[in-house]
Amino acid sequence: MPIQNFAISLDLVNRHYQEPNRNRYESRYFWEQLYPLIATSGFSAIEIPYEPVWQFGGRSGVPFNRYCVNTKYGDAAGYRAALAERGIARVTGITFDPNLFMRNANIDFFFGASGHFAGEALAHAADMGADYFAISPSPYYGRALHYHPDLEAQREAFTARTVSLLSGLAAKAQDLGVALVLRNEYWGLFRGEAILPLLAALPETVKLDVDTASLQIAGVAPADFIAANITRIGCVHLTDTAFVDNDETWKTANPEFPERRATQVFRDPGTGTVDLPGIAAQLASVGYAGPVTLSARQTRDPFRALLRTRALLNQLQN
């Protein structure tokens, strides 16, 4: 696949558990020094997580929401110009995770806050000229279960409210010219193939965001899943892992960091057991022309991860 088909996600900088320390990554200079390194690694396109939390912390250096972008650059156009000056030609996608709002027993709060900020993030995606807006359709299963012990009994009602929220976003996305795609994560209520009934209940404009590592951890072969659902795929995240979830880590409150093992879930692309070259070849063979994003999520060293991802990119182009 040609290099211009690939983007890299800024989730390679872990804002919660590791270096760079908070004083660095909450500063504008850190990101403006990072963009040329991304471009030098061969990427002219990026994906940006949308994280409302940064507008509540007193600083605005993390460019992961509308408030921070407007504070530092005036507006989205100003930020896009700053990216272009540093070798980043476009933002292919914005991602949104509602976990921040699963924080109490009030389910109305969760859906209300998630809907409000997802709508804000979707509008920001349009302002950034993004191709897609990738939303996690549920919070962590274990986090939701902690605040809602009757979650399984309420699954049908939870799903119905999720369909309502996503249907509203789908209509807005269509008006804005942005594709709404559902993230497929191993820790959610709609993990693995459980996302397919949810997708079937939504408008045809809503597509799948295939996360290769999450599928493998959930016990689903990524290649088989892609082959069976190619017509509904709107984005592919090439993520890597060597993690085997043999003790139901997906049901814990923080499934990205297993509480019963000293390990991590994700690996830098090309260092795990997911057949990423095979999946890239499969996508090319079926004529897939949609967004493909490489993610070094949870990496211990973002700068080393850039080099490792570039090494994988060299394989994917051969």
Task: Name what the model sees in each region.
Residues 1-128, 156, 164-167, 174, ...:
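N-terminal pre-domain/capping segments
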Residues 11-15, 51, 95-99, 138-140, ...:
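Active-site beta-loop-alpha junctions enriched in small/polar residues
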